[in-house]
């Protein structure tokens, strides 16, 4: 089995923690964590989802230039483990989150004003170096204040925020009567505004102090994030990380080029269309905990990987036949992929990682 006695372990863990949920996590704290997820993923979606279409159709960048700008996500993910190590040792996670959101907003404001490749590339890379670590930080903060098996239900509000980002497009097109939104720099300005609001709310989050004594210091292994690789001594976790590495390659291609493909197919309201996947994700995140309990981590991850195959088969068939509804199938199964494979993997990582390495372990997962 992928994890020895996995189903029984999860059932025991879930049962024990459900009994302490109300004592460990008050209603106020739960609202704060849900709001944190909502804002963090709204600010991601509002500018990143339509970026490829803006670069290719409005700025008329070369294909290789578009690819380089969009590689900023991978570059930014490299900072995740390092920021996680800092959070584990030196500063409260919610304070780091607030600072990173302010910096992300500032770089987005600069990026929105650029029209040539080099300065735009620089601004987007700097923005993603600040933004990508926030995804693992929000997971660490949430699972520090609620049982990890309940994390999918907190994380669901990130999906709500992602879907809600479409409201900017709706307001621009139907209330302000602008001729375009997704193909302009307006999403970057909207993303910056959400960043600043999120940073203010971050300062009200429950205190999440470092889990390691400052006197322990920080090594080169910690700075590079390599310390978290020690978790891969566990054969089960090693298999999981290899599968994650392989699965994330096509997954990122969907996020990076999805808006460009839909723009080429003349789909209207690209952000809203892609958000259908997040609507499905909201449903599957609600039931992810139950699936983990009944099926175990191994089967949950397998279900998610099967959904990956369905997605890309649908996109291939849609491209070959010209039938757009195949694209919608590929978009909707996003909920299965994200809820079962990626969020299930975050829960697994939190259970495997020792206390002093939880933030760094989540950072490593997001780096992959």
Identify the meaning behind each predicted range.
Residues 95-109, 299-314:
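Structural signature of the two symmetry-related core transmembrane helices
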Residues 23-74, 236-273:
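Helix-loop boundary and gating motifs at the non-cytosolic
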Residues 125-157:
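Cytoplasmic helix-loop-helix junction between adjacent transmembrane helices
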Residues 192-212:
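C-terminal membrane-cytosol helix-exit motif in multi-pass small-molecule transporters
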Residues 38, 107, 117-134, 245, ...:
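Hydrophobic core of transmembrane alpha-helices in multi-pass small-molecule transporters
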Residues 18-27, 205-241:
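Juxtamembrane intracellular "pre-TM" segments in multi-pass secondary transporters
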Residues 79-92, 173, 284-297:
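Helix-to-loop junctions at the C-terminal end of transmembrane segments
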Residues 68-85, 275-287:
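Central cavity-lining transmembrane alpha-helices of secondary-active solute carriers
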